[in-house]
Amino acid sequence: MRLILFALFIFVTSCNTDSQIIINKDEIVPLSIANNFTMTYTDSTITRSYVSGKTHYDFSNTELNYSEFFEDVELIIYDDDKTSIIKSDYAIIYNSLRFIEFNGNVEITTTNEESLTASQLFYDTENEWLFTEEKFQYSDKTNKINANRLDSNRDFTDLVTGNLTGSINVSD
């Protein structure tokens, strides 16, 4: 009798464990969670950029290999002649794709007095390309642009927009 109860107990608990494994199989759990986190990117011992946020979830353990940043997200990009700062409420970095998505109160400012605001912005880090399908505002020392779509290099020297309004200075 004891042997039958023991076998029944093992059978029930093993089935219960298997069902928990099956239930949790598709659940995506971050590899780590950090507060007040900063990630630095270097090239040949030179700091090229860093990204920070109040909360960071690392999902590099997933096939998509991404990180999420929440609250006061800031990406600072250093060049030889200028620095660019991108701020937002939320960002997701797709590490293997070399791609960043910014959402909520996105602001770009540069040391060349350029600024851009949007509700959403995508940044291709490999090609240094910015784009959005949302409304945005861009301004520099001589131009002020409001438009519905942006497709531009990070220096704003090759800028394509949709439904443009505002003022642009054109030189001959």
PLM regions and their residue ranges:
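Mature-chain termini and adjacent capping regions
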Residues: 1-172
